[in-house]
């Protein structure tokens, strides 16, 4: 059985955050390689299964019982926005380009929980469960994901992978779909190896203007 948490006025919260980002020095990054930057709010598309990373105030009925994370086909769902943040020690100033190999937190905008994984089996595929955890953006060390990409910085047009710092799995989708109450949504889980099921691309969102110019780099993907 699934359990739903408290409701809320989702759109005012999202609108307030997006307006807060649109201050001098913010806005869409249209220069250079079009980089993803710290503080940006975006949707992430799994490039193989064509679903966006999603969460909502519905908890898993098995495993950890934490807030569920899924993939949805809709492009206009407000529950698919995530904010790029640094670890608890910082290291991701607002507007700085995200480096390939950098560890980040992905915070779900409407619930304030961080993308998280741990050693629980996922409900459908029996891979590693991925959940949303924490309160107001504060969780634990299992919220950290390393951005694996080609070059020096995460480019908006490029495919990337997210490898979990604590358990080394890759954020993945393999096509399994849930029934009620989230019928049609896809299971998101962790897999131990890099493959076509775990490549993601930045899509819709608010991208903070880079505070430094990009430079040539290396290949991490």
Swiss-Prot record:
<dbReference type="GO" id="GO:0051787">
    <property type="term" value="F:misfolded protein binding"/>
</dbReference>
<feature type="modified residue" description="Phosphoserine">
    <location>
        <position position="215"/>
    </location>
</feature>
<keyword id="KW-0256">Endoplasmic reticulum</keyword>
<keyword id="KW-0732">Signal</keyword>
<dbReference type="GO" id="GO:0005783">
    <property type="term" value="C:endoplasmic reticulum"/>
</dbReference>
<dbReference type="GO" id="GO:0042981">
    <property type="term" value="P:regulation of apoptotic process"/>
</dbReference>
<dbReference type="GO" id="GO:0005788">
    <property type="term" value="C:endoplasmic reticulum lumen"/>
</dbReference>
<dbReference type="GO" id="GO:0051087">
    <property type="term" value="F:protein-folding chaperone binding"/>
</dbReference>
<dbReference type="GO" id="GO:0101031">
    <property type="term" value="C:protein folding chaperone complex"/>
</dbReference>
<feature type="signal peptide">
    <location>
        <begin position="1"/>
        <end position="28"/>
    </location>
</feature>
<keyword id="KW-0597">Phosphoprotein</keyword>
<feature type="domain" description="MIR 2">
    <location>
        <begin position="95"/>
        <end position="150"/>
    </location>
</feature>
<feature type="short sequence motif" description="Prevents secretion from ER">
    <location>
        <begin position="218"/>
        <end position="221"/>
    </location>
</feature>
<feature type="domain" description="MIR 1">
    <location>
        <begin position="33"/>
        <end position="87"/>
    </location>
</feature>
<dbReference type="GO" id="GO:0016020">
    <property type="term" value="C:membrane"/>
</dbReference>
<dbReference type="GO" id="GO:0051117">
    <property type="term" value="F:ATPase binding"/>
</dbReference>
<dbReference type="Pfam" id="PF02815">
    <property type="entry name" value="MIR"/>
</dbReference>
<dbReference type="GO" id="GO:0051085">
    <property type="term" value="P:chaperone cofactor-dependent protein refolding"/>
</dbReference>
<dbReference type="InterPro" id="IPR036300">
    <property type="entry name" value="MIR_dom_sf"/>
</dbReference>
<feature type="domain" description="MIR 3">
    <location>
        <begin position="151"/>
        <end position="205"/>
    </location>
</feature>
<dbReference type="GO" id="GO:0034663">
    <property type="term" value="C:endoplasmic reticulum chaperone complex"/>
</dbReference>
<dbReference type="GO" id="GO:0071218">
    <property type="term" value="P:cellular response to misfolded protein"/>
</dbReference>
<dbReference type="GO" id="GO:0036503">
    <property type="term" value="P:ERAD pathway"/>
</dbReference>
<comment type="subunit">
    <text>Part of a large chaperone multiprotein complex comprising CABP1, DNAJB11, HSP90B1, HSPA5, HYOU, PDIA2, PDIA4, PPIB, SDF2L1, UGGT1 and very small amounts of ERP29, but not, or at very low levels, CALR nor CANX.</text>
</comment>
<keyword id="KW-0677">Repeat</keyword>
<protein>
    <recommendedName>
        <fullName>Stromal cell-derived factor 2-like protein 1</fullName>
    </recommendedName>
</protein>
<dbReference type="InterPro" id="IPR016093">
    <property type="entry name" value="MIR_motif"/>
</dbReference>
